[in-house]
Structures are given as C-alpha cells and as structure tokens.
C-alpha cells in the first residue's frame, strides 16, 4: 500500500519482510487495525521466526480489542518465544509489550522502564520515543491542564517533531496529545500537514478535522471530514471491505455531522445522517456502543440534529416512531428513548417567551418520570455489575482451554448503559434547573446548572462530544426567559468555550443584547453570528432575524 505514512523500525529480516513490517507499522500508527494485521500476517508468513513481526501482529490485534484478544495474546507469546532472535532493540520492544500485557490496574511502570532503556540505548530511535510518549501520557486535569505524565508526553513528541518534522506517526499523536487540553491550536501545524503524509488513510485524512473543530474553524474541519469519507469509500469499494472492518468510516461521519450542525448546515447534517444510517456495520466497533451520541442515532438517525437545535416536537415525533423491538439486545436503547421522551416533554413545557405561560406542572411531571427511570436503571446496573464480578471469580476457576476459546463477536449489540446514564443525568439536572427558573428560584437553578456543567466535564473529552447540546446553551435560554441577562451572557460564553465560534452561542449573545435594548450591540452581535454562519441554511429563523437586525449591507454579502 502507498500513501499510508512513513514509519520504520529496522528488524532482522529480508528486505521483503522489512517492507511488510514497515507497512504494518505505518498502518498501526494510522489506527488502521484491519490492514495493519494483514500486513503483519504476511510478514509472519514470509518469516515465521521473526519475533518483531509477531510483535507487530499482536499490537494490531490488540487494537481490535476484546473480540480478538485471544489471538493477540497468542501472537505476543510467540514474539516472546522468538525475542532472542530479534536483536537487542527488538528484544526490548517485545519485552515492553509483554510488560504492558501483564500489567494490572493500568500500571504501566514496567513497560515505561523498558521503553526508557530502549530510548537511552538509541536516542535517535524515533519509534522508541513515540512509544515512550504513548506510555507516559496520562491526560489532563479538570482545568484542562496536562498532568505530569502528559507534560512528558508532550515534551517527547515536541522533540520528535523537531528531529523528524514529517514523521506521520508523530504528527498524528501530536494532534491527539493536544486536542483535549486548553491549547488545541498548538497542533494546527500538524493538522495542516498530516493528510499529505498519509493520503490513503481515511483516519489520517480525518484527523485534521479534530483540531479545526476544536478551534472553531468548522469550514476547514468540514473539508477534511468530507475528504476522509471519500478516502474510506474508495478503499471499501476497491478492496470489497465492509464498514465493520473500517471503523473510521462511521466515526468520521459522526464527527462530520456534529461539525455541520455547528455551522448551521442542518439540511446537510440530516442528509449525512441518512447516509450514515445505511452505512453502519453490525459490530460494536462500528455501532460505537460506548458513545452516547452514536446510540441516539440508532434510535433515529436525525435525532442528534433535532436535539442540537432544541426542536422538541421533532424529537418527540422521532422517538414515537422508533422501532427498537423487544428483548435484552435493545433494553438500553429503549431506556434511552424513554428518558429522552420525558426530557423533551419537559423541555417543551418550559419553552415559552412568556415565563408566566410555562406549563410548570407538565415539566415537573416529566422531570419526576425521568428521575425515576434513571434511579431504576442505576439500580439495575448495580445488580448487573455485582453479577459480573461473580462471573469473573467463576471464570478464574475455569481451565486454561476454556479461557483460550476464541470469543464470538455480538451481532447488533445493545448500547453500553454507563455513558447513557451519565448523559441522561446531565439532562435531568438541566430539566430540574429549568423548572426552578420557571418558579423564580434562580439561585437554586444556578446551582443545578453549575452541577450539570461539572457533570458534563466529567463525561470527558470525546470526538465528537458525547453531550450534544452544551449545558451553557440550555442554561442561557432559561435565564433569558427569566430576564437574567447577565446570567444568560455568562452561560452563552461558557458554551462558546466548549464550541468556539459556534453560531448557536453567537446568536444567543446577540439576542441578549437585543432584548436589553442595546441596538448597536445587537447589530454587532448578529453580524458576528452571520460571519460565523456564512453558509448556514437560509431558511433558519435565526439567519432571517439576524439579517433583518444587522442591516441590508450584511444581507447583501450572503
């Protein structure tokens, strides 16, 4: 394969085996597990005693996670058996992988120690430094600042990019290292470069979109997400591969849909949602059962768009038409649909420009049903977790032959419950806070909104965000109805920190200025909104209203 990157580790093998190994390694760094495994398998066929080839195969299989874990362990065991033939550096790569596999409770200290030895032995080994960076990284704190291990990861990757500025893997990992923190703009240079280093890889072409989305350059992000769709569809068509073996395809489209929404391109977002619905696979990797956003699309493909804009009538219509069947395989999806129905009913009851006309009783009733459903689900999950713990203890007593049986991948598995409950708990807090605003209890409402924002942060960084509509926007809309203009401005600004340059937040700020009677501020705000949404759906009421207030000269530029 060509156009997949430029990674290399010198191994003790023939030139042909080396070429297959490097192909597998580049694909591994592209997160292209399916093709990476195929390349390493070919290397193993040609050189069955190549320990590093087995090492690579184990890494590729590991990336496919649980359903392939038995095979990954066998490949790693074979690498360990052959490590004495792998050379001094190859032996350390294999030992580091073995240490990682044997680690308990995410303790990577043994692996890190071996990788440090490898880097010390050969400071110019780019791959060793990249693997060390991956091992030491431990993410960001609640304020978006890097933890100590993450600081070291960043420093290592910076040094690698200084020494090898066009290394495809280093630029890929640099984007991942920087995007969750407070300074995603530090990866803009890599975002501009990466796709040219691996133009065949759908994921590598997609990655620039992560950074451009984070910095609020949604138009540029759209370009890369669209290019990734083309790359993946060309690959699947030419190689007769299904979406189940190209996980990036679904991931990229989910991100593309989220990105279109932030630009006000709702018609395109809906059209791409329809395309995605027909393109999903049948396994957990392409159904994204751990992503709350993806599970919403399994109920109804256009549901995330309706939730993003707060079109509660459309949300309720889609939920009422959902056909999720019966039985255990859709239990969590049915729970999600029921909870979203109560949430939408409550939010609809609260939505009125005249706060005195709000149907508080209906909103309270919906909130109570939602909370009762969450309580029952949490209790059921606790019971399931207890049963799983018992099963694990029983499994520990089974014989080795039983443990090594190849696992069967579930077809059309249910959604994971935990991410759903986290997001629904946030929605519950929002709904309860909205009721308090309608009752005039603003101080109590602010506390609940603050709690909801904390919980939104705790969900963690995801690509795209699991929580579809930022808490700040719902808070601002409620406070605006209560004529708490200062509170609404602060809430919209908080939302814009999460989604920079999003037209939803910018429109909200302009609307506050208008309701305050600040005509000049409103015109300026609506102009900023129209600048951010130059290609938004012309039929959107926000666009029409902004143009009417901002002036004819702004309308003429559209």
Regions found by a protein language model. Give the residues of each.
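Residue at a conserved register position within TPR or TPR-like alpha-solenoid repeats
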Residues: 27, 61, 99, 136, ...
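Alpha-helical segment of the N-proximal tetratricopeptide repeat
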Residues: 13-42, 94, 98-105, 430-431, ...
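Amphipathic alpha-helical segments of tetratricopeptide repeats
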Residues: 45, 80-81, 120, 162, ...
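TPR/TPR-like (Sel1-like) alpha-helical repeat modules
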Residues: 51, 58, 62-84, 213, ...
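"A position-specific structural signal for the A-helix of alpha-solenoid helical repeats
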Residues: 22, 56, 94-99, 131, ...
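Structural motif corresponding to the intra-repeat A-B loop/turn of tetratricopeptide repeats
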Residues: 30-31, 64, 102-105, 139, ...
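Residue-level recognition of tetratricopeptide repeat
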Residues: 16, 49-51, 125-127, 166-168, ...
């Amino acid at each position: 394969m060509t156009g997949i990157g430029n990674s290399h580790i010198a191994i003790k093998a023939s030139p042909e085996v080396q070429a297959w190994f490097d192909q597998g390694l580049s694909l591994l760094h592209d997160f292209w597990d399916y093709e990476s495994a195929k390349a390493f398998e070919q290397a193993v066929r040609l050189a069955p005693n190549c320990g590093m080839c087995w090492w690579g195969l184990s890494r590729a299989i590991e990336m496919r996670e649980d359903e392939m874990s038995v095979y990954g362990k066998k490949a790693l065991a074979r690498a360990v058996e052959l490590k004495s033939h792998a050379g001094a550096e190859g032996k350390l790569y294999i030992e580091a992988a073995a240490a990682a596999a044997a680690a308990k409770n995410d303790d990577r200290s043994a692996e890190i120690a071996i990788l440090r030895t490898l880097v010390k032995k050969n400071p110019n080994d780019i791959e060793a430094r990249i693997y060390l960076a991956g091992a030491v990284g431990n993410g960001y704190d609640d304020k978006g600042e890097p933890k100590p291990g993450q600081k070291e990861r960043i420093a290592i990757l910076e040094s690698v990019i200084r020494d090898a500025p066009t290394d495809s893997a280093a630029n890929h990992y640099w984007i991942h290292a920087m995007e969750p923190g407070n300074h995603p703009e530090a990866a803009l240079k890599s975002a501009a470069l990466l796709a040219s280093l691996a133009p065949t890889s759908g994921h590598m072409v997609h990655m620039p979109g992560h950074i451009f989305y984070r910095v609020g350059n949604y138009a540029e992000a759209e370009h890369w997400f669209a290019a990734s769709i083309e790359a993946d569809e060309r690959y699947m068509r030419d190689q007769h591969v299904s979406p189940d073996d190209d996980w990036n395809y679904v991931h990229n489209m989910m991100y593309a849909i989220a990105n279109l929404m932030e630009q006000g391109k709702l018609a395109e977002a809906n059209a791409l949602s329809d395309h995605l619905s027909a393109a999903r696979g049948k396994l957990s990797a392409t159904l994204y059962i751990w992503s709350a956003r993806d599970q919403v699309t399994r109920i109804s493909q256009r549901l995330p768009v309706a939730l993003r804009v707060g079109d509660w009538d459309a949300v309720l219509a889609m939920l009422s038409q959902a056909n999720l069947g019966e039985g255990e395989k859709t239990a969590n999806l049915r729970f999600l649909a029921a909870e979203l129905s109560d949430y939408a009913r409550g939010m609809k009851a609260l939505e009125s420009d005249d706060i005195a006309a709000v149907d508080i009783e209906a909103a309270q009733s919906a909130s109570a049903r939602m909370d009762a459903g969450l309580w029952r689900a949490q209790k059921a999950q606790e019971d399931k977790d207890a049963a799983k713990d018992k099963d694990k203890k029983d499994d520990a007593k089974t014989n080795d032959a039983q443990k090594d049986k190849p696992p069967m991948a579930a077809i059309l598995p249910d959604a994971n419950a935990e991410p759903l409950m986290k997001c629904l708990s946030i929605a519950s807090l929002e709904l309860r806070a909205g009721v308090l605003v309608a009752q005039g209890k603003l101080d109590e409402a602010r506390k609940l909104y603050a709690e909801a924002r904390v919980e939104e942060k705790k969900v963690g960084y995801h690509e795209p965000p699991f929580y579809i509509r930022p808490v700040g926007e719902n808070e601002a809309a409620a406070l605006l109805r209560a004529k708490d203009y200062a509170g609404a401005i602060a809430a919209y600004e908080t939302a814009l920190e999460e989604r920079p340059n999003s037209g939803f937040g910018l429109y909200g700020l302009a609307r506050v200025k208008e309701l305050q009677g600040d005509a000049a501020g409103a015109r300026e705000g609506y102009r900023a909104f129209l600048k951010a949404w130059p290609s938004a759906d012309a039929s959107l009421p926000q666009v029409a209203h902004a143009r009417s207030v901002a002036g004819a000269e702004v309308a003429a530029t559209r």
